[in-house]
Amino acid sequence: MRATTRAVIVVAFVCCLSAVAIVVFRQSRSKPLAEGAGIEFPAAVSQATKVQLLKDDFRIITNVSVLPTPVLKAFQEKGGSRSLLANPGAKFNPSDVIWDASVPRKRLIFAGASTDRCFVHYEQGGRGRSYVIEVFGLRSGETMEPLWRGHCTRPADNLETLRSQITGGGCF
């Protein structure tokens, strides 16, 4: 009887330790995302400039990790390496109710890079889902310059649709 009692106590102890380890592991994996670096975009950009910004031949990007390095860093948490931008189709927080603070509130629709510019078109969760375009000038391998940040009335499926939206005033 005594051996059985000891076995039960040992099993219970191991189960408790396992439960604690699982909780600690899950909490470490679901650490809330920190804020990103504050990016200052120009206050006003003319319609002609907005149209001109997307005139280049852009290589389309559908994976966040393929963004040019300085732009990728702009979409990472400050002081960390986790992305604040989810890949297309990946889990993200689409509303103002945050169920998992470790999941980004922004999700890439698509991006594009040319020799001297990069744009990122993404959806952002909140009180209402919004569709954003951010355009950056690429100065070297490690620096970028924010050129324009706009809100679009709807998401674009491809670069031509995005260009049409901008030309027609659908991104302001």
Language-model features: locations:
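N-terminal secretory signal peptides that target proteins for export/translocation
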Residues: 1-3
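Short beta-strand elements that form the blades of beta-propeller/WD-repeat-like
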Residues: 117-123
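Solvent-exposed loop/turn segments at secondary-structure junctions
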Residues: 124-127, 152-154
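Residue-level detector of beta-propeller blades
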Residues: 132, 145-148
